[in-house]
């Protein structure tokens, strides 16, 4: 039986949570909506308690993205993600955070069939994770589903432009909106999603002019990823911006080389184990 995660204050100096319950002061969906045109919104992906603890003080939103398919599970794309995966990782991120609004991706196949299917699965995710909202990919075709959800109390973040769950139809992860017809369609998608009640919209992998036009046209905040600095906020896959992978998309800035840091630390450990210089008396219980 699933239960909502307990409210905890987290000690970020360790990997363990302080068991003393404290009042939460999370950013809410209405407060995110109010950020339209204001200070840019900071969003990153998180999949685990510890990463949520580290990101939370600096972020307005944490996205439990279906990008965990590649980052955590080594899958080739996001199509293979399940509801169980999203529920487990979503609950972990909620437990590991206290400030940021947590958004959970709805996996491929969990919402496209009908508005009722989408509601049932979205309600399950919110119940099992304690997250603030769900995110869905799609435009005009999905607008009735978004309206159905929002009218029934489920906050929805939209996602237009390059939609990774549609990789099999799109044929890859190339930039969208290069033709006038496709550019117009993406703008129409975003407007339809906003009018359906989405509280914010991710714009991914489009020409900058398209992202700016959408940001100027819709009343809700836009979150760019490979879009434009003029969006109302930005999101990246955390492991990409930390430099955990050798190959990253053009729109990623590597703020650290964490792959090098981890590799170096493991090499030092391995060398010390093989030379019997670890553990030392500092790490041994004498007796």
UniProtKB/Swiss-Prot annotation:
Chain positions covered by the region annotation Disordered: 1-24
Active site: 204
Pfam families per UniProt: Pantoate_transf
Disulfide topology: none
Domain of life of the organism encoding this protein: Bacteria
GO MF annotation terms: 3-methyl-2-oxobutanoate hydroxymethyltransferase activity; magnesium ion binding
Cofactor(s) required, per the database record: Mg(2+)
Binding site for 3-methyl-2-oxobutanoate: 66-67, 105, 135
InterPro entries xrefs: Pantoate_hydroxy_MeTrfase, Pyrv/PenolPyrv_kinase-like_dom, Pyrv_kinase-like_dom_sf
Cofactor comment text: Binds 1 Mg(2+) ion per subunit.
Keywords: Cytoplasm, Magnesium, Metal-binding, Pantothenate biosynthesis, Transferase
EC code(s) of this entry: 2.1.2.11
Reactions catalysed, as given in the entry: 3-methyl-2-oxobutanoate + (6R)-5,10-methylene-5,6,7,8-tetrahydrofolate + H2O = 2-dehydropantoate + (6S)-5,6,7,8-tetrahydrofolate
Record pathway: Cofactor biosynthesis; (R)-pantothenate biosynthesis; (R)-pantoate from 3-methyl-2-oxobutanoate: step 1/2
NCBIfam families per UniProt: panB, PRK00311.1
Function description: Catalyzes the reversible reaction in which hydroxymethyl group from 5,10-methylenetetrahydrofolate is transferred onto alpha-ketoisovalerate to form ketopantoate.
Subunit structure: Homodecamer; pentamer of dimers.
Stated name of the protein: 3-methyl-2-oxobutanoate hydroxymethyltransferase
Species of the source: Sphingopyxis alaskensis (strain DSM 13593 / LMG 18877 / RB2256) (Sphingomonas alaskensis)
Gene: panB
């Amino acid at each position: 039986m699933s239960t909502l995660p307990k409210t905890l204050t987290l000690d970020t100096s360790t990997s363990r949570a302080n068991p003393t319950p404290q009042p939460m002061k999370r950013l809410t969906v209405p407060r995110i909506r109010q950020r339209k045109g204001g200070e840019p919104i900071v969003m990153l992906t998180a999949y685990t308690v510890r990463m949520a603890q580290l990101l939370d003080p600096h972020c307005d939103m944490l996205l439990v993205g279906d990008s965990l398919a590649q980052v955590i599970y080594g899958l080739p794309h996001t199509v293979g993600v399940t509801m169980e995966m999203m529920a487990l990782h979503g609950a972990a991120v909620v437990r590991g955070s206290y400030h940021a609004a947590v958004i959970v991706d709805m996996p491929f196949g969990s919402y496209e069939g009908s508005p009722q299917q989408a509601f049932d699965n979205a309600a399950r995710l919110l119940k099992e994770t304690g997250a603030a909202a769900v995110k869905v990919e799609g435009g005009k075709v999905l607008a009735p589903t978004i309206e159905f959800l929002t009218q029934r109390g489920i906050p929805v973040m939209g996602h237009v432009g390059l939609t990774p769950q549609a990789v099999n139809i799109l044929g890859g992860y190339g930039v969208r909106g290069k033709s006038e017809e496709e550019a117009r369609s993406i703008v129409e998608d975003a407007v339809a999603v906003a009018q359906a009640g989405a509280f914010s919209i991710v714009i991914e992998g489009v020409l900058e002019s398209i992202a700016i036009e959408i940001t100027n046209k819709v009343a809700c905040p836009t979150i760019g990823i490979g879009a434009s600095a003029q969006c109302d906020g930005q999101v990246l896959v955390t492991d990409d911006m930390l430099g955990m992978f050798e190959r990253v998309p053009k729109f990623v800035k590597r703020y650290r080389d964490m792959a090098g840091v981890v590799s170096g630390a493991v090499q030092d450990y391995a060398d010390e184990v093989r030379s019997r210089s670890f553990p030392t008396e500092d790490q041994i219980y004498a007796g």
